[in-house]
A protein has these predicted regions:
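Peripheral interaction segments used for macromolecular assembly
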Residues: 1-78
Length: 78
């Protein structure tokens, strides 16, 4: 699956909480590896609980992604 196919997919937690929609990626320039995903948050998400970029998008670790199908499932740190 290509990164462009992931953009626009809904991102949710393992317990079904919708976090928002994947809008972009943060890439390590030296290695080209995806470090983080940027998520346009759903209205119900408390942004203060997450690390955000200057545009208010949630910054989630790429490694936290658990499954990708119709939606992207991510694991939140405890």
């Amino acid at each position: 699956m290509f990164a462009t196919e992931l953009t626009g997919k809904t991102v949710m937690t393992e317990d079904g909480q919708i976090l928002g929609v994947l809008s972009d990626f943060m890439v390590e320039t030296k290695t080209g590896k995806i470090q983080s995903i940027l998520v346009d948050p759903a209205e119900t998400v408390e942004r203060r609980l997450f690390k955000t970029d200057p545009e208010g998008r949630l910054i989630l670790s790429f490694r936290s992604m658990k499954a990708v199908r119709d939606v992207i499932v991510t694991q939140l740190a405890d």
